[in-house]
């Protein structure tokens, strides 16, 4: 049986070497095959660390290739994922981490000064996606040590985003999880398929915009 329609795996079966993510600043690309492999491996890591359907991860870092890999890992694991603007003050980041109940936190060496001012003692899984951070595991090492292939019981996750806080503190929007298998067409975010002629379509992901970044996936 192939991957569910309009998921990274589905597109990887058709155009594995086509770019799924293109970094606007550098031109760096992540292919559909890489996105499928890396998000699947991370999903396995998170499951092995005890995360289960309904748990929340948080991401706060600059725009980099790992950001959407992490989001897709959560999406296919039945997890909520909270994208936190990397330009917020540490106190604001701390509030969102505490409020969303994150049990895994992804950041990067570029955020070292801000991360050093956070209390992360209650978050069991800390991962640096780019570079080294004290007390954080390295993203590349986790992926290298994980088995390939998707989990056998993938479930739909979803984003947990925050309002801008213009009338007070930002408010988390904790929507109910779909409770459906990953790729269920009624509830899943979709990848716009490539046309047979190879024409690219660009999609702006909501969680990236609201986190103070923009990412285009083809």
List the predicted regions and their residue ranges.
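A short N-terminal helical cap/helix-turn-helix that marks the beginning
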Residues: 1-21, 215-217
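Structural core segment of the AMP-binding/adenylate-forming
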Residues: 8, 44, 48-49, 72, ...
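AMP-binding (ANL) adenylation modules
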Residues: 10-14, 49, 62-65, 186, ...
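Conserved pre-ATP/AMP-binding loop-to-beta segment of ANL
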Residues: 16-17, 144-164, 168-169, 182, ...
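Conserved AMP-binding/adenylate-forming core of the ANL superfamily
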Residues: 20-64, 68-71, 89-94
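Conserved AMP-binding A3 loop
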Residues: 29-33, 158-185, 202
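Conserved S/T- and glycine-rich ATP-binding loop of Class I adenylate-forming
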Residues: 57, 74, 105, 163-166, ...
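AMP-binding adenylation
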Residues: 186-188, 192-218
């Amino acid at each position: 049986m192939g991957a569910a329609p309009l998921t990274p795996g589905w597109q990887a079966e058709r155009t594995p070497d086509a770019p799924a993510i293109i970094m606007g600043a550098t031109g760096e690309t992540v292919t559909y095959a890489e996105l499928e492999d890396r998000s699947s491996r991370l999903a396995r890591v998170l499951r092995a660390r005890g995360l289960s359907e309904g748990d929340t991860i948080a991401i706060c870092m600059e725009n980099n290739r790992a950001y959407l890999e992490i989001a897709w890992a959560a999406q296919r694991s039945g997890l909520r994922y909270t994208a936190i603007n990397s330009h917020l003050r540490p106190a604001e980041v701390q509030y969102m981490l505490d409020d969303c109940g994150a049990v895994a936190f992804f950041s990067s060496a570029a955020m070292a000064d801000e991360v050093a001012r956070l209390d992360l003692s209650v978050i069991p899984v800390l991962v640096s996606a780019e570079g080294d951070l004290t007390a954080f595991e390295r993203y590349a090492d986790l992926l290298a040590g994980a088995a390939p292939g998707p989990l056998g019981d993938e479930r739909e996750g979803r984003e947990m985003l925050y309002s801008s806080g213009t009338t007070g503190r930002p408010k988390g929007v904790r929507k109910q999880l779909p409770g459906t298998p990953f790729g269920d067409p009624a509830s899943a975010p979709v990848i716009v398929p490539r046309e047979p002629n190879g024409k690219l379509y660009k999609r702006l992901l909501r969680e990236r915009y609201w986190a103070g970044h923009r990412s285009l996936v083809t």
